[in-house]
Amino acid sequence: MTPAPSTLPTATPETDPYALAAPWAGELNHDVEQWDARAEFPWEKWKVIQRSGLLAVPFETRYGGSAGTLTDTMRALEGLGHTCRDTGLGFSASTQIVSVGVPLQAFGSEELKSRFLPGIVTGDSITAHAITEPDNGSDALNISTTATRDGDDYVIDGGKMFITNAPIADLFLLYVRTGKPGPFGLSVFLVERDTPGLRVGDPLDKMGLRTSPLSEVTFTGLRVPAAHRIGQEGAGFLILDHVMKREILFSFSLTLGEMEHRLRRVLQYAKSRRQFGEPIGTFQGVAHKIADMKIAVETARKWLTDTGAKVETGQDAAIDIAATKTVVSEANTRTALDAVQIFGGQGYLTATGIERDVRNAVGGTIYSGTSEIQRNRIASLLGL
């Protein structure tokens, strides 16, 4: 098993992508409570993310990237999760990497890659992918937004909901229906924000990840050149599968880093906080919660590491992806609640940031496919 990052003190950004965010901790963690309360995207902190080089990790050098592997990208995001207490900002960074850049590099034309990837890699062009619809949340294969061929263009009509980064995005990757019902009637298009017919709604107020904006996006007679299609017509399911595997691996590597930091903080508190003349960590009830947190962290690490290796080497990882997403998201919520309990009244206060962890964690059991959908998928793949 890969040792916990805390046991690798000599790691540097040059030797381990995990360390990319660490030099910027002070700037990333400034006034986190205030940004969360205002539910605003922290633009100055985004510039810090840009300077860190984290956004460049998985992209080819000819587009300004670092030519890192899938594992490198997971490590970079794990390190960001450990370093940055603004989980919403981290989530937007993960979305920036996977939403448009990853599928564009894998499936896009050279013309589109040369034109758009450099800005994506630097973070100057913020990206979002539009999959979820108001009437089709977890049922992504029944997308109803349509794209109709009209000469050299497609005309897109419909709408999407809960689109991360949409209020600030410059580029959108749209998953739409160009053919018959089912997975093989889907296609994917790259669309710029200022294209006539594309409307971005107001940011939606939400429980957690409050600095990561999301909104509705609607399309009315949105005319997109056929040259902006990513991959072949009807290849949308293939692209979606490629993206969703990486979305889960990347965003929950971020979560793993958050869990590592939470464990370290809880352990420090349990050793220093005294009640009845003893550190509270000596009480079995507290000690067992912390032991369970350590088990949860290492279980999450094992699932992410093994599943990432399968995806990176092209092995079938359908069950592994669903299990990883379920295990890590639910462990994150459980350990966040345990941290509140260990901190007691202090954990209930916004100033400590512990309650914010709970609000941020809950979303992980919903986005990228709910825990219930993941269990359904596992059962189906087992032949049930």
Question: Which residues does each predicted region cover?
Answer:
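A structural signal for short hydrophobic beta-strand segments in well-ordered beta-sheet cores
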Residues: T145-T148
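Alpha-helical interface subdomain recognition
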Residues: M1-C84, F107-L112, G119, G123, ...
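A short, charged helix-loop
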Residues: S215-H242
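A short, Trp-centered hydrophobic/proline-enriched beta-strand micro-motif
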Residues: G123-I131
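Short Gly/Pro-enriched turn/cap motifs at secondary-structure boundaries
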Residues: D135-S138, F162-N165, T178-K180, K206-P213
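Flexible, small-/acidic-enriched active-site or ligand-binding loops
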Residues: N142, D194-P225
